[in-house]
Every structure is written in C-alpha cells, then in structure tokens.
C-alpha cells in the first residue's frame, strides 16, 4: 500500500496536521477537493525527479526492466513509488547511484506526495504494482555521496 490515507492541501502545502495521527481521510473523501496529498505508508519510498530529461531516462529503465512500481507525471518530471529497501531519512538534491539527481521521501518519517494541485490530479502513467505491492527500491536508485554529474560526462572524464 503506497498511502496510509489522504489530507487536504492548499496547492502543494499541507493544511492538515498529519504527524502522530492515524485518522486520515479516504480517497473518496478527498477526490472532489481542489488539492490533496497522499500520506506515504511506512514502507513506501518516493523518488522525485524534477528534471524532465532525467525522469525520462529512469522511466525508460523501469519500463524495460518491468519493475513493479507506480509512476506519476508531474509538471517538471516524475514521481516513482517503490517499497523502501532500508532508507532511513529523506534527502533533497541528492545523486542516485545511477547518476540522476533526485529528492527522496520516505513514509517512516511522515512524508506526503501531492496528488492533486489546483483542480488537476496528477496522472498515473505507469502502475504494475499488483495490489500496490511494489518492488524494493533498486540499489542503483539509492543515494550516493557525489557531486559528479554523470549524465554530462564524456569519454575520458572521471
């Protein structure tokens, strides 16, 4: 299960308290709202790629490998939802082992994913996670300590 419930937002900003709480709204209760978010379940990890080109590279890999996950189209890139493989904190502007820059959100620290903004629901463009049972986040999508821009390297660099 990707989300443990839903909360109302104002655009992308959450307007309901969601920490230390279990009485979240259902999808049916929020679907008519102008903006809402899903509270990530404990076992969910969200990989947020804001660069369109980089998000397309990862999307192609996921489709070719047939990975079980869910992918949302965003205004700038894509959100990829997987089962957490042991990450214990959220990260911003980190490099993944595959060389792509991403933000990472994890459910066990009360994170949310905006699903509808100003009346427009984010489109699910890929979802082959049966009953929302996704694959573990692949090792090549875990954060690494590096500031090298692998995608911009040429032969002989590094």
Predicted features and spans:
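DNA replication initiation modules
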Residues: 38-53, 59, 83-158
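Histidine-centered active-site/metal-ligand motif
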Residues: 79
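Signature for HUH/AEP ssDNA processing cores
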Residues: 1-76, 85, 148-155
């Amino acid at each position: 299960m990707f989300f443990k419930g839903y909360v109302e937002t104002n655009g992308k900003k959450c307007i309901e308290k969601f920490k230390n709480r279990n009485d979240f709204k259902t999808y049916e209760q929020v679907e008519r709202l102008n903006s809402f978010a899903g509270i990530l379940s404990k076992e969910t990890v969200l990989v947020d790629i804001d660069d369109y080109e980089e998000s397309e590279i990862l999307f192609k890999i996921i489709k070719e490998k047939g990975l079980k996950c869910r992918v949302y189209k965003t205004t700038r890139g894509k959100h990829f939802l997987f089962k957490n493989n042991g990450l214990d904190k959220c990260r911003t502007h980190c490099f993944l082992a595959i060389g792509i820059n991403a933000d990472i959100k994890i459910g066990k620290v009360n994170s949310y994913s905006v699903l509808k903004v100003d009346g427009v629901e984010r489109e699910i463009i890929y979802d082959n996670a049966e009953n929302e049972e996704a694959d573990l986040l692949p090792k090549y999508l875990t954060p690494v300590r590096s500031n090298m821009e692998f995608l911009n390297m040429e032969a002989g660099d590094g």
